[in-house]
Regions:
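Hydrophobic/aromatic-enriched cytosolic interaction surfaces used to assemble or bind macromolecules
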Residues: 1-188
Length: 188
């Protein structure tokens, strides 16, 4: 007999679905995959001898530098440490609080995980990504997220209008300055 009796579900949440999500009576274990409309990304280069807290502080600094004062209210997380650059993700803390409020302690449901769409897609495709890297393309209503993985880790991440991703790849190729870029585009 399995001890895992709770129903598990994954819910994909778009910006126009947040209020409906809050009205739902959830049961079981729930993983929320947030649309990249909710997420901001930046690349954090490895820092010799830096602690995890210092790298997180660097990610927060980069978001503040890029987005200004509004970034102060964001929750920031870093991808797992590896040999190369890491991906930092920021999500407005008020959105996360609204999600958590849907799952009171002792209730019939438990919020197991909240993941931005790019990271959920990456985790699902990780085994298909060649060692030399690939472009990861995640298309959502009205926009696309295009990330580049290189042999040395995360190399770039951009949000563009839904139909602009091919131009963005060409622009990245022209700016590469001799750097080897992947040919493979994984549409996730």
């Amino acid at each position: 007999m399995s001890l895992s009796w709770r129903k598990r579900r994954e819910v994909r949440l778009s910006p126009d679905g947040l209020e409906a999500f809050e009205r739902e009576k959830w049961t079981g274990d729930v993983t929320v995959v947030l649309s990249d409309h909710f997420a901001r990304y930046t690349i954090v280069q490895p820092q010799d001898g830096a602690t995890a807290e210092e790298e997180l502080a660097l990610a927060r600094f980069q978001f503040n530098k890029i987005h200004g004062e509004r970034a102060r209210g964001w929750e920031v997380r870093l991808s797992r440490a590896g040999a190369g650059a890491r991906l930092a993700c920021a999500i407005d803390a008020s959105v996360l609080e609204r999600l958590k409020a849907c799952f009171p302690k002792g209730g019939k449901a438990r919020l197991v995980s909240v993941q931005p769409a790019l990271m959920a897609a990456y985790n699902g495709a990780r085994d298909r990504i060649p060692r030399e890297g690939a472009w990861l393309l995640l298309v959502e209503a009205g926009r696309a997220c295009l990330a580049r993985l290189a042999a040395h880790g995360w190399a770039s991440v951009h949000h563009v209008a839904e139909g602009e991703w091919e131009r963005l790849i060409e622009r990245e190729r022209s700016r590469a300055g001799g750097e080897s870029l992947p040919d493979l585009v994984l549409k996730l």
